[in-house]
Amino acid sequence: GHLGHRLLFLHLENENESAEAVENRLVRMITEDRDYIEKLSICRNAVIAFFQNIQARYPNGVTWNTAMDNPRAKQIIVRAALMLKSLRGTIDPKDATNTIFEEPTRLTQSFYNICRGHALMHYRTHIIVNDVESVLTIMLDSAPPERKKLLLTLLKQNGEIDADQYVEISKHGHKRVLDEFNDFEILNIVEFIQDNSMKRIRLKPEFSWLLNKKILKMIELHN
């Protein structure tokens, strides 16, 4: 329905690890590593210790100080939710006007809760801009992979790219690239701009906040 997905994703990847390194790591895991029960116990004890620490610090429970929340952080949370809403839109192949977008309320609340969890880990009961870094990563990782790839490329190209450029970068065929461009227009992420006979897209103004230097730096740390 329009309420949207209940799941958000965070990809944990180590793309720089060679096949040989992966093999060696897995061999060590089954020959030298702790067994599953011991690992489970270590993780369980770490989680219990964390919550005991929080409980000791806030014996009467955590009272969230919303008045101290950074307004800029809240703005980024809302904008990230609206961005993911567009990235996850479901396009009707027979009628693009029937594209379904999720209601961003749930996304906004989920992102806010993630930021609050990060703040609490640093013993704060209010959020600051640094807390939104994980939300930006989750925003991208929760999008379909090819849409994430096109958006990241747009950001690296300062918000504009033409079809030939993206064919070269993505290694996709020209028709597929044009289809992806059209999808982004349907999803209200980009607009087509005049560039002689070349198809060229530009990030819509409502998403230009992603081109902010601090935002880009946060995104680049995880991509």
Regions found by a protein language model. Give the residues of each.
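Short amphipathic alpha-helical interaction segments
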Residues: 103-106, 171-187
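A short, conserved structural fragment
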Residues: 185-195
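Short acidic, hydrophobic short linear motifs in intrinsically disordered regions
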Residues: 157-170
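Short, amphipathic alpha-helical interaction segments positioned at domain boundaries
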Residues: 140-143, 205-223
